[in-house]
Amino acid sequence: MKQPHIQLDESLNVRYAILPGDPKRAERIASHMSEVEDLGMNREYRSLVGAYRGARILAMSTGMGGVSTGIAVEELHNIGVTHAIRIGSCGALQTDIAPGELLIAAGAVRDDGTSRAYVREGYP
């Protein structure tokens, strides 16, 4: 069934997704893939699918914030995506972190409503 926000369905047959916030970043991700198919854009959700090292991968923007990302992840789950990586940019307070340095977050300050629906209070 076509999902109401991302406008994709199970026929896409993809298990892996890379999720930037910005639609232009979805295009940039797709530029590293072969056999790219532009699936279009609905609201903040820019979707392109392609192949990378033998895997079929969806690059789809989520917009900013937890609510739009939550919608994206739930609808992707509904169409069979089992692995998703959210990527993006951030600021740093530590002076030893250089611009452009790769960071992998182990936790986050949560002061929103969306994450409370998924994990208990106090979880990183």
What is each of the regions a protein language model found here?
Residues 1-124:
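Metabolite-binding pocket within alpha/beta catalytic cores that recognizes anionic/polar moieties
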